[in-house]
UniProtKB/Swiss-Prot annotation:
Residues 636-651, 858-872 have a biased composition (Low complexity). Residues 24-476 are annotated as: Catalytic 1. Residues 1-23 form the signal peptide. GO terms for molecular function: cellulase activity; cellulose binding. The linker region (also termed 'hinge') may be a potential site for proteolysis. In the C-terminal section; belongs to the glycosyl hydrolase 48 (cellulase L) family. In the N-terminal section; belongs to the glycosyl hydrolase 9 (cellulase E) family. Keywords: Carbohydrate metabolism, Cellulose degradation, Glycosidase, Hydrolase, Polysaccharide degradation, Repeat, Signal. This is Endoglucanase A. Residues 634-703, 855-906, 1059-1113 are annotated as: Disordered. Residues 652-670, 680-698, 1066-1108 have a biased composition (Pro residues).
């Protein structure tokens, strides 16, 4: 193939845009030295001894453990702590290139060792990231979590997941860039370490092959939003091949490098290789061209690199890079200096080469010198930290700042100097602010220094300089790192109570410790003189954040000096946040009553005497110790000994790990010795006194109590550009209130008069129903000169008694984003980050104050009293009301008529830069981001400018537009939709963008900055951008787009209108044009700008997805799916929490398997995946499916931190504990002598996936931490794993004790909850998870269909990685196929030998599998399950895993095991089919859960005994009709896909029974079975179905369970469609399903989906059901509920009494009535949506 490149000859200008450097302007040796040292401050992992500073320590030592790897090492990216391998490997390559080109400079300056150290350090890390040929880990750390915390690297506590690319989920750009780094490193390290260089080279070759074979970045997703590979991967393929050629001299690589040149980035709309952008982490083609030019001497490459360097120097093709007034070549606001200095390096390297034209050598060199000198300070200030004149002192860098308080403002200075760091650089006008929050101009990064180092090496060769001899960054601490503050709470004649706070503000380096303790010294002379012993002192604590107080201990007996030991061992204290770096204890020391205590002679009393109660001072007389080493304070004298006492020794027990299966007794592992720690007491905080000012005139809070306000502060920094008060309004009265009568006032100081904007990001009542008004007070008062008035539209509805509005998320800001100071604001309570009553946020009904206290001195609103009627005071007129509300423009403005010729402008006054931010052609939102450039010579008033974006509307609808953010102010941007008089190619509409006068003047050579625009149709139906005139799909970065036209005074001055459009007038070079005025623009939105905040990142808010469209061509049932899908995703419905986790139900008072509605289950997550798979089928949008899987993986699959599974013996997987019929037989004793079998899966899975971690969902999660256990037992974080069922098949949900999966003995009794379930001599801290196999199988089933449908659409590549995850989940799901203790099938004696492998496999999907282990990783265990219910089987998933090439698991036996399981499952159904056709219960391999002998005559299935209710028995598991519908739907799908005859026969009989029992009533209602009654048993299975004449079923109760109705209909539809494919069409089954769908839809729709009334007679068990607790056992729930013998269900769940539905339930119980509720269960809504889509897919509009 012949490839033609188009090059345009450059134009050389005569004026140099830069200031020439003076020879030897700076000490380049010192600059080079420090620029290299910068990388020492970025090092992650265990630091080597050659590091030259004392403030960096080991960090991120667990990186990679989530995948069973050591991924420690490398560099942190910037001022954060994520390891992004794309910019990191680019940096590694650039440093090696510097050493390759300018080795002499490094040798002469003494810096060669230091740069080679860094090259070796980073490439060693890359080797770790490449554990096998086609696996590469490209990122460690989560950008969102990392950026949400501000603190030093050494004490990070957040999860740091690792992300990989593979053959099926590739990332060619990052893999090839890493190959380049390793190849380049192999060259420069060859002399120093030839063995390591050879290793690097081999990895480079393998990685290059990986990148080249895959040629895709589809798997490179985790870095999106941070380091997207915008330029693609072909530039990296060339770049890496060049370095491999240089390393190997193998011409094959040179050929490869040249072959990809044709694919390098092009100038938009042309075939010209891009020459404008800089060589950087994303785009390395300019560097590749330079090296290819030097290697080949070909003109092609010379011209590429010279056009680039010409553009950056004298100009090329009439264009030149922008220069600042002081001479910086300025490319972009982000890292302007990194681009300029890297281009300088390329200029140096190319000008050094003999092939560079003589006339250009000096030009390029002088350019390079000027840019480096600019960075070093030629303008009067240095941009390199720690170098030169006026250098940056406050870079945006967490570890250098070293905050202990998770705050950019604490401390107010940087504790460390980040020597050598090149900051981002100035704006285009040379402006620069040295501020920690200025991450645009003042952040640093590895890639910023990457080209800078090489350029400095060249400057050193040119001009010399003297590195500082033996330079090290050894610092003297600027503050006390550890100290104690103390004060007196109270004192009396015989006691003193001390309030003490231990502080860890360490920074040299920062360190976390859980071994702090202090000594409080006392003189006991008075006590001893009175005849008492020191041991008669009494010690007690009040508020305690984790200390153990003991003593007294002798210090100096001759002087009667003793000390009290306050030991925080076990409590982690680290410089990572307000509640992390300090811990408080309040302890009392009391002598006997008649002893007169004299505090004045106590050594530790010296500094605290006279301190007012509640206050503290720093005191050196209370010494502090870290692991017995004194780190603070002074001890009294030296006459005594100072041992660190051990008051009591805890013996080392033998651990007894326990599992948490659902629902079954807890299994245990072989014990390993583990220390049992003393649990940390739960703190009881003291309340903060509230000061109530006396106002004048008096404003009295309401006493009528109609409403009150709950407040949560979501911005804890006092200095901030955004205030975030989140609110809930509570109706505390007895009658409903119309919310449109209610207003709320938030009082604050504006701190600089500006226009302001407010918005509700999300509100349960609907954000669009919330209004805002800013009101300026007539005169300022203490704490306020403004208030924000929050009101409600009529759509907010009525607020019922005892209810609240739900969360209302509010934020407001000044339009110029300047800061507020909240510190003195009346309504702000810094510490109230969770909801509580705030009386300083006032509430009004009809303008009358009914809640709270207005600030003193305001003219108060009227107040409400029980007797007086008050006339409301009118609200003052607000000074600013910029509330953003999107306003649609349904009626288009006609196109103005003018001259019928459209000629591109030649006047050149302005041009438009465009970036496309929506690359999908089919979308419901168009996102053109723009910049307007003044390319003329005089300023332009932007109010005269309009822009037109031309497109096709694709279905006439009202439309809305908004600017989310604009540098000129989003409120200054206007919009108007204009319909063309007749359609033309590419357009029937244009969006006209205009500017208000506030946008100001646009100066010559300047641009407006970014204007972020999006528009949509008001019904959110789709556009098809594919044929739109203005849309350029590939232009995702800014470039000139002449199809976006621009006008001044209505005259076309830029771009080309579509052919045939009635054009605007145009400007030509000579005639004078009378412009046609454009009608005044009609704004369609008054937007609120939302740039990144300057202090802290925006917190996560409730998910607010873009409303989905109804795709064109859908019939009635597809439209139903879309309607319900939107209801489920509408935040106002309440199906998800703010993290995107689906609740079990919208309603909270509900008790089923989860005992609270806002828990969730793996079942809900599996339905979530299924719902979004169907959404992808109907819309072609697979992003929602991916989000569902990502959320599932993030929250429901335990992470590496959640499951430290490091020590597991598959030959002894667990210790036996029997199951018992009823809870009162528990705890179950461990029996160590009972044999258990071998686990045959473990080694195979570890070998396949390289990890000991399990990949399956735990079944139960406390989404919002309702119980209070927290994630991994921290007590506070939401989304925590919990468990309930533990004690045999008779333990109903009403008899469970909810407990944490992460057991640290913090709650429950002394052994946590373990000794309720397992009897042992000793108990150890441990974790336990339980998998519900039917849920994992459903997620796999759904993913199979997603795969099929995505392939039909040609979009399989979008979800291929998720199909791989489903296959992996299926690999691990095989544990459900094995007996609990791996006993052979038919085992009827617990003492019989265990299985030796697959002889323990029953191949069915059992009730659960479970795994667990010690918190410290010392031991682990796994179990299967002996009990299998037909309702858990999933032949559809089994078939996919056994037969589908994309779904087959990777392990050697995975697919074959699933093939056996598929056959066994179908036999299981046939064995259990009753004479009538319904399916009976299941089978067990462990009779009574203890491997007892089967009763005589029991039917068997492959040696397993028939069990009517093989799972739970209260109520009997197979009395519930739901299992029939759920399970047979999967059989029907399997039949539809395969035509399997056994499945068809099974279904034919089952469907016949269904038709006979479903009721379609004449009044339009329906009923399906709800409760079944069983008799008899099946015949023993011999491979043939006998008809089971002795197994019978009766329907004993009916209902309208909507979710099960949907699942039943789904089964009927797939069966019917299968009969149409493979036999005689059962249209009756289809019609029955359709009738059920139609009746359900007609009868039960509501505002949140579909719901039917449910009578809940079982709810009396809230009050009556005793939860069995053994006599004498006592403990506590996290909220303080006492657990003891005799407690009822509600006694240990007292928080239910706060539920809004509790009064209704309680009233019904007291009156003897059966309460009735409506529920919106997440799984049921999904089932209903899915079945409607199933009808659409299978039968269309029939």
């Amino acid at each position: 193939m012949v490839v033609t490149f188009l090059f345009i000859l450059g134009v050389v200008y005569g004026v140099k845009p830069w200031q020439e450097a003076r020879a030897g302007s700076f000490n380049y040796g010192e600059a080079l030295q420090k620029a290299i040292m910068f990388y020492e401050f970025q090092m992650s992992g265990k630091l080597p001894n050659w590091v030259r500073n004392n403030w960096r320590g080991d960090s991120a030592l667990k990186d990679g453990q989530d995948n069973g790897l050591d991924l420690t090492g490398g560099w942190f990216d910037a001022g954060d702590h994520v390891k992004f391998n794309l910019p990191m490997s680019y940096t590694g390559t650039m440093l090696s290139w510097a050493a390759y080109e300018y080795k002499d400079a490094f040798v002469k300056s003494g810096q060669l060792e230091h740069i080679l150290n860094q090259i070796e350090w980073v490439n060693d890390y890359f080797v770790k990231c490449h554990p096998s040929k086609y696996v590469y880990y490209y990122q460690v750390g989560d950008g969102g979590k990392d950026h949400a915390w501000w603190g030093p690297a050494e004490v990070m506590q957040m999860e740091r997941p690792s992300f990989k690319v593979t053959q099926s989920s590739p990332g060619s750009a990052v893999v090839a860039e890493t190959a380049a780094s390793l190849a380049a490193a192999s060259i420069v390290l060859k002399d120093r370490n030839p063995t390591k260089a050879a290793t690097y080279l081999q990895h480079a070759k393998d990685l290059y092959e990986f990148a080249e074979v895959t040629k895709s970045d589809s798997g490179y997703t985790a870095a999106n939003g941070y380091y997207n590979s915008w330029s693609g991967f072909y530039d990296e393929l060339s770049w890496a091949a060049v370095w491999l050629y240089l390393a190997t001299n193998d011409s094959t690589y040179l050929t490869k490098a040249e072959s990809y040149v044709q694919n390098w980035p092009k100038i938009s709309g042309s075939n010209i290789i891009d020459y404008k952008w800089a060589h950087c982490w994303d785009d390395v083609h300019n560097g590749a061209a330079l090296l290819l030019a030097k290697i080949t001497d070909k003109d092609t490459y010379k011209q590429i690199i010279e056009s680039h360097l010409d553009y950056w120097t004298t100009g090329y093709n009439g264009e030149r890079i922008k220069y600042t007034p002081k001479g910086l070549a300025w490319l972009d606001q982000w890292g302007s200096l990194r681009y300029a200095t890297t281009t300088a390096f390329l200029a140096f390297v190319y000008s050094d080469w003999s092939g560079c034209p003589t006339g250009k050598k000096e030009t390029y060199r002088k350019f390079g010198e000027s840019q480096i000198d600019y960075a070093l300070g030629s303008t009067g200030r240095s941009f390199v930290v720690g170098f030169g004149t006026n250098p940056p002192k406050r870079p945006h860098h967490r570890t250098a700042h070293s905050s202990w308080a998770d705050s950019q403002s604490i401390p107010s200075y940087h504790r460390h100097t980040l020597y050598g760091a090149l900051v981002g650089g100035p704006g285009s006008d040379d402006s620069y602010t040295d501020d920690i929050s200025n991450y645009v101009n003042n952040e640093v990064a590895c890639d910023y220094n990457a080209g800078f180092v090489g350029a400095l090496a060249k400057m050193y060769l040119l001009y010399g300089g003297n590195p500082i001899p033996d330079f090290k960054a050894i610092e003297t601490p600027t503050n006390d790192e550890f100290f104690v503050e103390a004060g007196i709470n109270a004192s009396g004649t015989n006691f003193i109570e001390i309030k003490a706070i231990v502080n860890n503000q360490s920074g040299w380096p920062a360190r976390a410790t859980n071994k702090l303790k202090f000594r409080y010294f006392v003189d006991l002379s008075e006590l001893i003189k009175a005849g008492y012993s020191p041991n008669q002192l009494t010690l007690s604590t009040n508020y305690n954040q984790g200390a153990k107080v003991s003593g007294p201990y002798v210090w100096d007996s001759s002087r009667n000096i003793y000390y009290i030991l306050v030991d925080f061992t076990g409590t982690l204290i680290y410089p990572g946040g307000q509640d992390k770096y300090k811990k408080e204890v309040q302890f009392r020391i009391a002598a006997p009553q008649n002893v007169q205590w004299d505090n004045s002679n106590d050594y530790s009393f010296q500094d605290i005497k006279g301190v007012s109660s509640g206050s503290v001072v720093k005191t050196k007389y209370i010494p502090l110790y870290d692991e017995d080493i004194k780190v603070w304070g002074e001890e009294p004298g030296t006459s005594g000994v100072s041992p660190t006492p051990t008051a009591s020794v805890t013996p080392t027990p033998t651990p007894t790990p326990t599992a948490t299966p659902t629902p079954t007794p807890t299994p245990t592992v072989t014990p390993t010795p583990t220390v049992t720690a003393t649990p940390t007491p739960t703190p009881t905080p003291t309340s903060t006194p509230t000061v109530t000012p006396t106002p004048t005139p008096v404003s009295t809070p309401a006493t009528s109590g109609q409403i009150k306000v709950l407040y949560a502060n979501k911005e804890t920094n006092s200095t901030t550009n955004t205030i975030r008060p989140w609110l809930k309004v509570v109706n505390s009265g007895s009658s409903s209130i119309d919310l449109s009568r209610v207003t709320i006032r938030y009082w604050y100081t504006v701190d600089g008069e500006r226009a302001q904007s407010a918005i509700s990001d999300w509100a349960q009542i609907g954000a669009s129903n919330v209004t805002f008004k800013f009101v300026k007070l007539s005169s300022s008062v203490s704490g306020a000169d403004y208030y924000l008035e929050i009101g409600f539209k009529s759509g907010a509805g009525q607020l019922q008694p005892g209810k609240d509005t739900g969360e209302i998320q509010i934020r407001f800001n000044k339009d110029d984003w300047s800061n507020y100071n909240q510190g003195n604001d009346w309504s702000w309570i810094q510490s109230m980050t969770s909801y509580g009553e705030n009386e300083k946020v006032t509430a009004y009904i009809d303008g009358v104050l009914v809640w709270g206290q207005e600030p003193s001195g305001t003219t108060p609103a009227p107040t409400s009293t029980p007797t007086v009627t008050v006339t409301p005071t009118p609200t003052p007129t607000p000074t600013v009301t910029p509330t953003p509300t999107v306003t649609a423009t349904p009626t288009p403005t006609p196109t103005p008529t003018s001259t019928p010729v459209s000629t591109p402008a030649t006047g050149g006054q302005i041009k438009v830069l465009y970036a496309n931010k929506e690359t999908n052609s089919t979308t419901n939102t168009i996102r053109p981001w723009l910049k307007v450039v003044n390319s003329g010579s005089s300023s332009i008033d932007l109010s005269r400018v309009t822009i037109r974006y031309w497109y096709t509307v694709d279905g006439e609808r009202a439309q809305s537009a908004i600017s989310d953010w604009a540098q000129i102010g989003a409120s200054n941007v206007t919009f108007k939709f204009v319909k063309l008089s007749s359609s033309v190619s590419g357009a029937d509409y244009y969006l006209e963008i205009g500017f208000k006068s506030g946008a100001g003047q646009l100066q010559p050579g300047k641009d407006t900055g970014e204007i972020q625009i999006r528009f949509n149709k008001d019904d959110w139906s789709n556009y098809n951008q594919g044929n739109d005139w203005s849309w350029i799909q590939s232009m995702t970065s800014y470039g000139e787009n002449e199809k976006v036209t621009a006008y001044i005074d209505g005259v076309l001055v830029w771009g080309q209108e579509p052919s045939g459009a009635t054009p605007a007038p145009t400007v030509t070079p000579t005639p004078t044009v009378t412009p046609t005025p454009t009608p005044a623009p009609t704004p369609t939105a008054t937007p609120t700008p939302t740039p990144t905040p300057t202090v802290t990142p925006t917190p996560t808010v409730a998910p607010t997805p873009t409303p989905s469209s109804t795709p064109s061509g859908l019939g009635k049932y597809g439209q139903r799916f879309m309607w319900l899908w939107n209801k489920i995703h509408d935040p106002a419905s309440g199906y998800f929490n703010q993290d995107g986790i689906p609740y079990h139900s919208v309603e909270t008072l509900i008790c089923e398997a989860p005992d609270y509605g806002h828990l969730t289950t793996s079942e809900a997550f599996s339905y979530y995946v299924w719902l979004e798979a169907v959404y992808g089928k109907l819309t072609g949008d697979w992003s929602k499916f991916k989000t569902a899987w990502d959320t599932l993986e993030k929250y429901m699959i335990p992470s590496a931190e959640d499951q430290p599974m490091r020590s597991y013996d598959p030959n002894k997987p667990a210790t036996y504990a029997g199951e018992w019929e009823t809870p009162d037989k528990y705890p179950s004793p461990l029996e160590f002598n009972v044999p258990v079998g071998k686990d045959p899966l473990h080694n195979e899975l570890v070998s396949t996936y390289g990890s000991t971690l399990m990949y399956g969902m735990h079944w139960l999660m406390d989404v919002d931490n309702w119980y209070g256990y927290g994630k991994r037992g921290d007590g506070v974080s939401r989304a925590s794993f919990i468990n309930t069922f533990q004690r045999g098949p008779e333990e109903s949900v009403w008899e469970t004790v909810p407990h944490p999966s992460w057991e640290e003995f913090k709650w429950g009794g002394p052994n946590g909850f373990l000794d309720l379930f397992i009897k042992d001599q000793n108990y150890s801290k441990q974790w336990r998870y339980t998998n519900a196999p039917d849920a994992d199988a459903r997620a796999i089933q759904a993913t199979y269909w997603a795969k099929v449908w995505a392939k039909e659409q040609g979009k399989f590549n979008e979800i291929s990685s998720y199909v791989g995850k489903a296959a992996k989940m299926g690999d691990y799901l095989r544990y459900a196929m094995f007996d609990k203790y791996f006993k052979p099938l038919g085992c009827q004696d617990k003492n019989a030998a265990g299985g030796t492998g697959y002889d323990s496999a029953h191949y069915l999907l059992s009730w659960y599998y479970a795994w667990g282990g010690a918190l410290d990783g010392a031991w682990s265990w796994k179990i299967g399950c002996s009990h299998a219910h037909f309702g858990y089987q999933n032949p559809m998933a089994a078939w996919a895993l056994a037969n589908d090439s994309d779904m087959k698991p990777k392990s050697p036996n995975g697919a074959s095991d699933w093939a056996k399981s598929l056959k066994r499952q179908i036999e299981f159904y046939r064995w259990l089919q009753s004479a009538e056709g319904a399916i009976a219960g299941g089978a067990t391999n462990s009779w009574n859960g203890r491997y007892e002998k089967y009763p005589a005559g029991t039917a068997t299935f492959y040696g397993m005994a028939y069990e009517p209710n093989p799972v739970y028995r209260d109520p009997g598991s197979n009395t519930w009709f739901g299992f029939q519908a759920w399970s047979m739907q999967r059989v029907a799908e399997y039949y539809y896909v395969t035509g399997d005859k056994d499945a068809g026969t099974l279904l034919e009989k089952w469907v016949s029974w269904i038709k006979s029992v479903v009721k379609l009533n004449s009044d339009g209602t329906f009923a399906i079975p709800s409760t079944l009654d069983w008799s008899g048993q099946p015949d023993t299975w011999n491979g043939t179905y006998t008809g089971n004449p002795n197994l019978h079923v009766k329907v004993v109760d009916y209902g309208t369970d909507l979710g099960i109705t949907a699942s039943l209909a789904n089964a009927l539809l797939y069966y019917s469609a299968g009969t149409k494919k493979y036999g005689v069409f059962d249209e009756e089954a289809k019609n029955l399903a359709k009738e059920l769908l139609d009746r359900m839809w007609k009868l039960y729709r509501d505002e949140k989906g579909l719901s039917a009334p449910e009578k809940r007679a079982d709810y009396k068990r809230f009050f009556e059901q005793e939860v069995y607790i053994p006599a004498g056992w006592t403990g506590k729930m996290p909220n303080g509920d006492v657990i003891k013998s005799g407690v009822k269900f509600i006694d240990i769940r007292s928080k239910y009494k706060q539920d809004p539905d509790w009064p209704k339930l309680e009233a019904a119980y007291k009156s003897g009535q059966v309460p009735e509720f409506r529920y919106h269960r997440f799984w049921a809504q999904c089932d209903i949506a899915i079945v409607n889509a199933t009808y659409e897919i299978l039968f269309g509009n029939q």
